[in-house]
Amino acid sequence: MVHHFEPRPIPGDVLDRILESALHAPSGGFSQGLALIVLDDPDQLAWFWKTTGGNDFGDPPPVIVLPIPDKRAYLERYSQPDKGGPDGPFAVESGWPVPYWDLDAAMACMVMLLKAVDEGVGAWFFGIFEGQAEVLETLGVPDGLRPIGVLAFGYKAPGDRMEGSSVTIPRRTFGHLVHRGHWRTD
């Protein structure tokens, strides 16, 4: 992930290809319950950073994207006859053992992160830990919806390098990741 960005803008066609890639991410029942709010105006970006506690991570990106899943699209889709109908288990939120609206939004984020790399654009995913209510209200996000995080896009600044836990904590081994046939504790 890139934390230090050049100030130069991303050409519109490049940014559009990154954003469009989200349309090709998995979508449970083809519910397509995802919206992307794109902020690329310098004044809007300055407001975002001020509202959310600043950009003390490095040089700010020229574009941020808020991926906002909409569970209502999933509940509506899964109340259709081919998905169990209005009385089926997935027609209500409590019927979902995992909130697929968030999962699908996360997969769309991963697709956009990978497309950014393909386009030569640096990227980073982070969370909003301060000011989220004000961000949602100011951007006109409907009640009950919230972003799963924020994607930052821009060209990597010279000298950007991994810092913090990415450098100090060793990556887990393949053997600790993969459990074949059953859960291992060793």
Where are these regions (language model features)?
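C-terminal helix-cap and adjacent tail motif
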Residues: M1-V2, Q80-K83, I148-D186
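Small-aliphatic-rich amphipathic alpha-helix that forms the alpha element of a beta-alpha
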Residues: A22-L23, V65, G85-T138
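Glycine/small-residue-rich phosphate/adenosyl-binding loop
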Residues: F30-A105
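Residue-level "edge-of-site" marker
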Residues: A35, F129, G149
